[in-house]
A protein has these predicted regions:
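Active-site cores that bind ATP or allylic diphosphates and position pyrophosphate for catalysis
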Residues: 125-129, 133-279, 283-299
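A glycine-rich helix N-cap at a beta->alpha junction
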Residues: 88-105, 116-119, 123
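Glycine- and acidic
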Residues: 29-38, 130, 239-250, 283, ...
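N-terminal catalytic cores of NTP/NDP-binding nucleotidyl/phosphoryl-transfer enzymes
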Residues: 2-83, 234-253
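A structural motif corresponding to the C-terminal end of an alpha-helix
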Residues: 59-61, 115-128
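Catalytic adenosine-cofactor/nucleotide-binding cores of aminoacyl-tRNA synthetases and other
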Residues: 253, 258, 268, 280-423, ...
Length: 651
C-alpha cells in the first residue's frame, strides 16, 4: 500500500489543488440511494467531499456541505438481506416500504440509511443531511419539475445526442406514484398540460416490477412523483445552487450519467454544472461493491473495526483519481496503522502549514486523539494473544508518567480494533502462540541466525528496559554478529512464536519475562565453522569497507580467533583435527557511536596432526601485516586485544 498523503508534488494537498481557483461561497453536495446495507466504498465520496469542505473552512471560505438521501427512488432489486416478503414492494418508493420486522426505523430507506448516518457522527463528517421525500413533498422541486416537463423534447434530444439513448416521442422525464397501486418504478408519463401529467402504470415497463395497468392524470407536484435521477441530479444543482459535487468514475464517462445531467443543466436551466471531482473505485480485496446486491463489506462493519481517524486516513490519504484497494489481511492492516502512526509521530509542532499537519487536520476527529504516542497495532495483536497479560495495565506500567486519559481512550479504541480483527479477520496463519519450548522449526535457521540468538542470550541486559532500548540492543547485536536485520528478526520470531513475522522485536522483549528470553536464546547452538563461513568477508571486502567509512571511524580494536574441528567422538587431547580456520574480528566504533564487527577470513588449514599454537602464531604474524594495511588505508591505529583465542569444536 503506497503512501499518497501528499497527493501532488509541492506544498498543496490534493484537496487544496481542487479548491485553489475557487472564489465566493461554496455549496458541496453528495448523495446515496439506501437500496440495501451501505457498503464501505460509499464512504469514499462522503470523505472526499468532507476533506474539501474542511479545506474550504480552513481557508476561511463560506461553505455548506449537503448530503442527500435519495429515498424516493424505487426498490428495483431485493436487498441481499431482504426478506422474501419485500417482493410485493418492488417498484415502490423506498421511503414508502415498511421497515423490516424488529427494526426501529420508520421505513425501509430509513432502516438502511440510519446505520450509515451513524458513522457520519463518529467520523465528524460536517454534512447537513436532507431526504428527497421531504424535498419533493414540500414542493421545493415544483419549479424545476415544471420547467423540465415543459422542455421534455429538449431532454429527449439530450438523451439521444449525449448518451445515444432513444426515448419515444411522447416520453416525459417524470415518474408518478401510481394512485392505484403505489408503485413509482412502473409508471410512464406521456403528456403534461402545465398542471397535470398523463401516465400509465405498465405491466411490462421494467423486468423487476409489474405495474397494475392503471391509467390516469395527476399533478406532478408536492411529492406525487419524482424526476429520473439524471434530471433529479440537474434539479438539485439548480435548486440548491450546488458548486462542487464529485462522482465515481463510472458516472463520469463520456455520455454517462454525469455528462447527461450537465447537458440538461445547461440546456434547460442555463446554469453551469458544479465543479466535478471524479474518483476511482474503492475495492475490497480487488472487488467492486454494490449496496443493493450486498456485494462487499458493510460500512458499519469496517467502522466497528477501524478507529475513526484511521478510517478517515484510509479514505482521504489517496488522491481521488487513484483506486483504493482495501484489505483486512494482516500485512495491509498493520501497514495502514503503521503509516498513520508515522504521520502522527512525525508532525513538526512548529510548522503549521506542513503537509503532514494538513493531512492530520483533515483526518482527525478530535485534535487530542492525535496528540499522543500510539501503541503499535501489530504489538497489540500479539499482546492480546499472549497468556497472563493484562494488556492495558502492562502498557500503562511501561509508559513514562503513565497513561493520560486521552492515551487510555486511544488505547481502548486500538485494543477494540485489534480484538475485532482477531475475532473476524485473522487467519490461522496470522495467529501467534508463545512457544513453551524451542519449536522444531528452529533447526531450519542458518548458523548465522543461531549465532545471533546465542549472542542475544549472552548479552541480554539486566533489569527492565523500554521498547526502544531493547530495539537498540537487538540492532547492536545484529552488527556484532554480523547479520542482516531481516534475518535477525525472523530468527527471533521463529524461536519465540514459530512464525516468520511478529511485532516489533524490542516491544516483544519489553513484555516477556527476561529469564525466559535468556533461557530460550542461550539454548541455541551453532556450528562455528558454518557461522564463520556465512558471516566472514574477504580481505579485499574488508579494505573496501574501511575505504568507504574512512573519516567516520572513532575507535578500532581487533582479536585473532582460531577454530579447529575435532573428529566425532575424538578427545581434544589427542590433537587430531580434520581442519580449521583462522579469522580476525575487527570491532569498529563509528562517529555515530554504533559498533560494527567485521570477521575477516585469513587462513585455512587441514591435516591429521596440526599444531594449533603454530597456526595461531602464523595467523598473528600474517594478521598483523594485514592490519597495518588497514591502518594505512583508513589513517587509524588498531589495538590488538590479547593473544589468539583457540576454539575446538566437535564435528
Amino acid at each position: 500500500m503506497a503512501n499518497n498523503s501528499t497527493g501532488n508534488a509541492g506544498n498543496l494537498m490534493w484537496y487544496e489543488k481542487i479548491i485553489e481557483g475557487l472564489t465566493g461561497p461554496q455549496i458541496i453536495n453528495d448523495s446515496k440511494t439506501p437500496s440495501g446495507r451501505v457498503h464501505i466504498g460509499s464512504l469514499r465520496g462522503v470523505l472526499i467531499h468532507d476533506a474539501i469542505y474542511r479545506a474550504l473552512l480552513d481557508r476561511g471560505t463560506e461553505v455548506t456541505y449537503r448530503y442527500g438521501i435519495d429515498d424516493y427512488d424505487s426498490l428495483d432489486g431485493l436487498p441481499a438481506d431482504g426478506a422474501p416478503s419485500l417482493q410485493e414492494y418492488m417498484g415502490y418508493p423506498l421511503c414508502n416500504i415498511p421497515a423490516p420486522t424488529g427494526s426501529k426505523a420508520t421505513d425501509l430507506a430509513d432502516h438502511y440509511i440510519s446505520e450509515f448516518l451513524g458513522i457520519f457522527k463518529e467520523l465528524e463528517v460536517g454534512a447537513q443531511v436532507y431526504r428527497m421525500r421531504d424535498i419533493y413533498r414540500s414542493g421545493r422541486f415544483n419549479e424545476a419539475i415544471d420547467i423540465i416537463l415543459k422542455k421534455s423534447d429538449a431532454v429527449r434530444k439530450i438523451y439521444a445526442d449525449v448518451s445515444h439513448a432513444d426515448r419515444p416521442g411522447d416520453w416525459h422525464p417524470f415518474q408518478v406514484i401510481c394512485k392505484n397501486c403505489g408503485k413509482i418504478g412502473a409508471t410512464q408519463v406521456t403528456a403534461y398540460d402545465g398542471k397535470e401529467v398523463t401516465y400509465q402504470c405498465r405491466e411490462d415497463l421494467v423486468s423487476w416490477a409489474r405495474g397494475c395497468g392503471c391509467n390516469g392524470k395527476v399533478s406532478p407536484f408536492d411529492g406525487n412523483g419524482k424526476l429520473p435521477w439524471k434530471l433529479e441530479w440537474a434539479a438539485k444543482w439548480h435548486t440548491f445552487g450546488i458548486t462542487i459535487e464529485g462522482a465515481g468514475k463510472d458516472h463520469c464517462t463520456k455520455g454517462g450519467s454525469r455528462d447527461v445531467a450537465a447537458h440538461c443543466l445547461r440546456k434547460i436551466f442555463g446554469d453551469a454544472p458544479p465543479l466535478n471531482v471524479p474518483y476511482e473505485f474503492f475495492l475490497v480485496s480487488g472487488a467492486k461493491m454494490s449496496s443493493s446486491k450486498g456485494i462487499g463489506t458493510a460500512a458499519r462493519e469496517i467502522a466497528n473495526f477501524l478507529p475513526p481517524e484511521i478510517l478517515r486516513f484510509l479514505m482521504i490519504r489517496t488522491p481521488p483519481r487513484r483506486t483504493v484497494n482495501f484489505s483486512t489481511d494482516f500485512d495491509y492492516i498493520v501497514k495502514l496503522f503503521n503509516e498513520y502512526d508515522r504521520l502522527v509521530e512525525n508532525v513538526p509542532p512548529d510548522r503549521a502549514f506542513d503537509l503532514q499537519r494538513k493531512m492530520l487536520r483533515t483526518i482527525e476527529v478530535n485534535p487530542a486523539s492525535s496528540a499522543c504516542h500510539p501503541v503499535g497495532f501489530q504489538l497489540l495483536i500479539a499482546l492480546l494473544q499472549l497468556p497472563h497479560i493484562e494488556v492495558e495495565y502492562e502498557i500503562g506500567k511501561r509508559t513514562a508518567g503513565g497513561l493520560t486519559q486521552q492515551d487510555q481512550e486511544n488505547l481502548k479504541k486500538r485494543l477494540s480494533a485489534a480484538t475485532y480483527w482477531l475475532d473476524h479477520h485473522a487467519s490461522e496463519a496470522d495467529r501467534i502462540e508463545l512457544q513453551a519450548s524451542l519449536p522444531a522449526s528452529a533447526t531450519e535457521l542458518s548458523d548465522s541466525q543461531r549465532a545471533f540468538l546465542h549472542l542475544l542470550g549472552e548479552r541480554f541486559p539486566d533489569g527492565q528496559l523500554g521498547e526502544e532500548e531493547y530495539q537498540k540492543f537487538i540492532f547492536d547485536i545484529t552488527r556484532l554478529t554480523p547479520i542482516n536485520q531481516k534475518n535477525a528478526f525472523a530468527a527471533i520470531y521463529r524461536v519465540l512464536l514459530d512464525k516468520e513475522h511478529g511485532p516489533k522485536g524490542g516491544a516483544l522483549f519489553a513484555y516477556l519475562d527476561r529469564a525466559f528470553l535468556v533461557r530460550r536464546f542461550s539454548e541455541i547452538n551453532f556450528s562455528r565453522e558454518a557461522f564463520w563461513n556465512e558471516s566472514g568477508i574477504t580481505r579485499e571486502e574488508c579494505k573496501d569497507w574501511f575505504r568507504k567509512n574512512k573519516g567516520q571511524i572513532a575507535c578500532t580494536n581487533a582479536k585473532y580467533l582460531v577454530n579447529a574441528l575435532i573428529p566425532a567422538k575424538e578427545s581434544p587431547d589427542l590433537h587430531r583435527y580434520i581442519r580449521g580456520k583462522g579469522v580476525i574480528e575487527i570491532n569498529v566504533i563509528l562517529s555515530d557511536k554504533k559498533v560494527h564487527r567485521l570477521r575477516v577470513m585469513l587462513s585455512d588449514f587441514e591435516g591429521e596432526e596440526i599444531d594449533l599454537k603454530s597456526e595461531a602464531d602464523y595467523l598473528e604474524v600474517y594478521g598483523n601485516n594485514f592490519l597495518k594495511e588497514i591502518e594505512t588505508i583508513a589513517n587509524i591505529e588498531i589495538e590488538i586485544t590479547g593473544k589468539p583465542i583457540i576454539y575446538k569444536d566437535d564435528q
